[in-house]
Amino acid sequence: MAAAANEKDFSTAILESKTKNTLIVCDKDCSKLRTYQVGLHPTTLNELELFESDYVRILGKKKAELIFSTVALESVPPRHIAIVRDGRFNLRIRITDTVKLYRVDKDIPVVSKLNFLPIKDTVENIRGNIFDEFVRPFLDFNFMPLTTGSIYGVTSGLGRVEFKVTKMIDAQDMEIKHGSVTSTTSVYCDETISREEVEKEFNMVGYDDVGGCRAQMAKIRELVELPLRHSQLYSKIGVKPPKGILLYGPPGTGKTLIARAIANETGAFLFLINGPEIMSKMAGESESNLRKAFEEAEKNSPAIIFIDEIDALAPKREKSQGEVERRIVSQLLTLMDGMKARSNVIVLGATNRPNSIDPALRRYGRFDREIEIGVPDETGRLEILRIHTKNMKMSEDVDLVAINKELHGFTGSDLASLCSEAALQQIREKLPQIDLDSEKIDAKVLASLKVNSENFRYAIEHTDPSSLRETVIQSPNVKWSDIGGLEQVKQELRETVQYPVEYPEKFIKFGMTPAKGVLFYGPPGCGKTLLAKAVATECKANFISIKGPELLSMWVGESESNIRDLFARARGAAPCVLFFDEIDSIAKARSGNDGSSGATDRMLNQLLSEMDGINQKKNVFVIGATNRPDQLDSALMRPGRLDQLVYIPLPDLDSRVSILQATLKKTPLSPEIDLRQLAEATDKFSGADLSEICQRACKLAIRETIEYELEQKKKGSEMMDLEDPVPYLRPDHLVQSLKTARRSVSEKEVERYEAFARSMKVDVRKFDKKNDINDDGLYE
């Protein structure tokens, strides 16, 4: 066991920095550096075996790289590197990011011709000669290294101008990526380029834009990046690299984003295939389009062929209606089999319905690996939230960690939508200060735009997780304080549902699996439904309420499918409370014959198998409520399914007082009203009965108010001069209401519930004979 504990986990090794030339970016004393220089501490220079003024190649993100000259700076911390603002922009990095540094051993070619484009918005207001004022002073350093495609900024007394290097030609008239500028370099200025075009190039998706799936990204990078970059690893060890990877998971979890990020970071050619683009009404043309896509990818290798929604392009042939779909599946199989082992082409497929794909595709040699890109957990969601808010102006009161705790079940696209809605709400708040007909917006208004916590609160209330949009999802606003009495039941529910969500580490410590379900049983009107809603609210879980008949369907197999889909959606939105009201309608004791109850029996079997944990439940809690527990199938009530059987009895005296206080907490009451006296007069009344008494009393007060006002109108009195005739609820209203009150639960029914509750208890006295234990199983 000790050896197993000390084993190193290599599953995410590809994500770790493994070389001494990895440095942390900082901006210490950047004012002492020129555009083409980087600052390093002398000890770091020694470690890397570098001298001052050596040329180094620095790798940033998304395949960005630049050549710099080194400068020794004591102020830069060891293992850090100071890079000027333009350099950080070109490398797509920020302060505290890491970069890799390599010595440039060969000479950098001298640039004979240099073409550049000024960025339009930086030269619009410049009146002087741009070349003389900005470009010539900038290029006045001998052997200054530049990189094609990079943006450089020059500041003078007239302002700041930025330009993009578009082309560099060496002495042999060849285009080069890196080169050094000298006094002999010919410089050509072309037309201007817009800021939008520049940002479009620099805003490519990279690994840093993908969050919430660290383990999956490690697997994908192993399977895609290694064969594309270092195929010799596979040939040396004597195995073939993978040909295809299938990414599956709910919509909006980042499958397409991952494919684009890998293509950009590896520099691979990305060929995107969408089903409708391949399909053609002409016979044989669809297969031809598919062949052309693979041929194009092989010509541009290393390449990634990304087939989005592959289930539409390659469905199961035995279930496919059209001949075209069958031929396309066959063609895809042939093309994947015909791919050369080391052709530097990888096929990525994405789907949210993996079981709809033809099984012939899902074998080794075709789609070798299947990786689930699921709904992110709490850590993943926070990572994604930080990605979506990294460029957002936010006020100091925004606490992303606290916001994240309320976003159970949100996918990456849901979180993007949430951030967008929060920003939009901030703009709405500023609209009264904005003249929409004016060409420009006041600079003060623009400067005051900051997304605050209230904007996020609004966005949370108006954004639902996409996995639950098909289901009628409720966000109950019922708290423990809204439910009178039942203190022992509330504590039991906290331990069963709330604790596994809030304190999962405690369950791991004691090696215990949390309970899967709770059954509320008892007389009608005692607060079973209300308790389920309070549980969901208090543990900030999603809440899905299901009525039995909603799941029934006239088609064979459809009812069971509805239950499967329901649990799948609940798992996607975990932690989630599934509340089956009147569960006896779909979980009656099985009859054992093939009569009309066959559909109900099949539904019960499906419900049992879902609750048995055949599929991992991921904090999905099932709460059933019934007032006919004797009719439920006994298999449903065993441990491992509905673990906790909670009897919700008629309220006792203290509980009745609490219920009356909760019901009347927003009602103005006369000081003469004694709720305890009212509770004593309503023995054996359920919570619903007490609520009805209070409602009827309030109706009487409202009736009295309206009748008085109508009477005064007839007399011609002014309404403004009238005093409120009924300022609060009086004792006589309650007395009048009590005269028509009735109990909804008879003595006979109460006895039946209590007999059932006794039958489900264990006689603890047989186990512990040393102590006196009362009938409730408590020590006296």
Swiss-Prot record:
GO terms for molecular function: ATP binding; ATP hydrolysis activity; polyubiquitin modification-dependent protein binding. One of its GO terms (biological process) is retrograde protein transport, ER to cytosol. Keywords: ATP-binding, Cell cycle, Endoplasmic reticulum, Nucleotide-binding, Protein transport, Repeat, Transport. It is found in: Endoplasmic reticulum. InterPro entries: AAA+_ATPase, AAA_ATPase_domain, AAA_lid_3, Asp_de-COase-like_dom_sf, ATPase_AAA_core, ATPase_AAA_CS, CDC48_domain_2-like_sf, CDC4_N-term_subdom. Pfam families: AAA (PF00004), AAA_lid_3 (PF17862). ATP binds at P251, G252, T253, G254, K255, T256, L257, N352, H388. PROSITE patterns: AAA (PS00674). Its main location: endoplasmic reticulum. One of its GO terms (cellular component) is cytosol. Belongs to the AAA ATPase family. Component of the ribosome quality control complex (RQC), composed of the E3 ubiquitin ligase LTN1, RQC1 and RQC2, as well as CDC48 and its ubiquitin-binding cofactors. RQC forms a stable complex with 60S ribosomal subunits. Involved in spindle disassembly, degradation of ubiquitinated proteins and protein export from the endoplasmic reticulum to the cytoplasm. Acts as a chaperone that collects ubiquitinated substrates. Has a role in the endoplasmic reticulum-associated degradation (ERAD) pathway. Component of the ribosome quality control complex (RQC), a ribosome-associated complex that mediates ubiquitination and extraction of incompletely synthesized nascent chains for proteasomal degradation. CDC48 may provide the mechanical force that dislodges the polyubiquitinated nascent peptides from the exit channel. This is Cell division control protein 48. It comes from Encephalitozoon cuniculi (strain GB-M1). The lineage of its organism: Eukaryota, Fungi, Fungi incertae sedis, Microsporidia, Unikaryonidae.
